[in-house]
A protein has these predicted regions:
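Metal-dependent active-site segment of extracytoplasmic phospho-/sulfohydrolases and closely related
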Residues: 15-60, 96
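Substrate-binding rim/cap in mid-to-C-terminal beta-strand-loop elements of soluble/periplasmic
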Residues: 61-95, 99-100
Length: 119
């Protein structure tokens, strides 16, 4: 059943506050990982396979517990590489293999998202 308007408003606020806290915690952790990577000249990829917190409440007021199909960010930190625009989840494994200097198996049909920085 659909919650009452007042209950729905409280629920939405609590859920959104929890989502914001979770995102802030992730931001702090990612910052630490990236700073460590930069200090040690590591290549780092930060990715996600789905979204959710950007659409936490359905239009009818019920909670959205499903993963969204919205685009998610992919972040590469490296001094000599950058990503091309756009890609799909299937491109991640070939990208990681290229970063590791490992040849992509023929069974992988997707491509790496890397290319050198244009100078």
């Amino acid at each position: 059943p659909k919650p009452s308007s007042a209950a729905s408003d409280v629920y939405k606020r609590q859920v959104m506050e929890a989502a914001i806290k979770a995102c802030e915690a992730v931001d702090i952790c990612v910052k630490e990982v990236i700073e460590t990577a930069l200090a040690n000249d590591y290549t780092t990829i930060v990715i996600a396979d789905h979204g959710n917190c950007e659409t936490m409440i359905n239009p009818d007021g019920t909670p959205n517990t499903a993963h969204t199909t919205n685009p998610v960010p992919i972040i590469l930190v490296d001094k000599e590489l950058q990503f091309i625009d756009n890609g799909i989840l299937g491109d991640i494994a070939p990208t990681i293999l290229e970063l590791m200097g490992i040849e992509k198996p023929a069974a992988m049909t997707q491509h790496s998202l890397l290319h050198p920085i244009q100078k």
